[in-house]
Design a protein with these regions (language model features):
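Exported/periplasmic cell-wall-interacting domains
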Residues: 64, 148-221
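Solvent-exposed loop/turn segments at secondary-structure junctions
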Residues: 47-49, 106-108, 116-117, 126-129, ...
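Loop/turn positions that initiate beta-strands
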Residues: 45, 77-80, 214
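Surface-exposed loops/turns
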Residues: 43-44, 71, 76, 132
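Primarily a LysM-type cell-wall glycan-binding module
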Residues: 27-56
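Cell wall/extracellular polymer interaction/catalysis modules
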Residues: 59-60, 67, 75-129, 140
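Intrinsically disordered, low-complexity regulatory tails and linkers that flank structured modules
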Residues: 1-32
Length: 221
């Protein structure tokens, strides 16, 4: 491996001859950067949810890495382990495609080989149930997912991170209740969901078919 700053390293399985060939041919060569786990020292007023949000790491993953803590009574001055960001990217990375989402702008952009393809109006999670900024990847495809806790059918669902073990947040089309009532069509472009990224039905189907498992999804505040 090759050491970088802050303990990061480059992937171990690259062939230097491939790198040289790419350079000679003016081609692109993608490296994978491995991030180490980090330590965070609890400060006055910290809550685990706010630490998780700032660390761009799901709450439950920090809790799992620190099984002895009481999340409702953090001890000021104690150290927490923040898991490696690479744990959020478990699949082989699709390097030539990327999805970028802005919570502030309520927009999504798709890129291929570094070139902008499309821009979409979206809705992310409301402040009480926010979408978590961070770098993730498409991990699941489900033509119609169902969230029983909210009675929501979610078409063309792409799972990108687990808000809690087994509970996926993702990208999908406008959801419907079991009664057939469609939600949030009139508020696209504003925060509306329980944490997922919502799109109109046609756009969601297009993204579903375009983004295979492994495509990186970058969510910015």
């Amino acid at each position: 491996s090759t050491n970088l700053s802050d303990g990061k390293t480059l992937q171990e399985n690259f062939d230097i001859e491939d790198v040289v060939d790419a350079w000679r041919n003016d081609d692109r060569y993608d490296f994978i950067v491995w991030h180490p786990a980090k330590t965070y020292t609890v400060k006055e007023g910290d809550m685990l949810s706010s630490i998780a949000y700032r660390a761009r790491m799901p709450y439950w993953m920090i809790l799992e890495a620190n099984p002895s803590i009481d999340p409702d009574a953090l001890v000021v001055g104690s150290d927490l382990i923040i898991p490696s960001k690479n744990e959020l990217l478990p699949l082989p990375i699709v390097t030539h495609k990327r999805i970028v989402i802005s919570i502030t702008e309520q927009r999504m952009w798709t890129y291929k080989n570094g070139e902008l393809l499309d821009e979409y109006v979206i809705s992310t999670g409301v402040d009480e149930s926010p979408t978590l900024p961070g770098v993730y990847q498409v991990q699941t495809h489900e033509l119609e997912a169902y969230a029983s806790v909210w009675d929501l059918y979610m078409p063309h669902f792409l799972g990108i991170y687990q808000g809690w073990p087994g509970f996926w947040n993702g990208i999908h089309g406008l959801p419907t209740l079991s009664s057939g009532v469609q939600l949030w069509a009139s508020v696209l472009g504003s925060k509306a969901s329980y944490g997922c990224i919502i799109m109109d039905l046609q756009s969601a189907e297009k993204i579903y078919n375009w983004a295979e498992d492994g495509v990186v999804v970058e969510i910015t505040p």
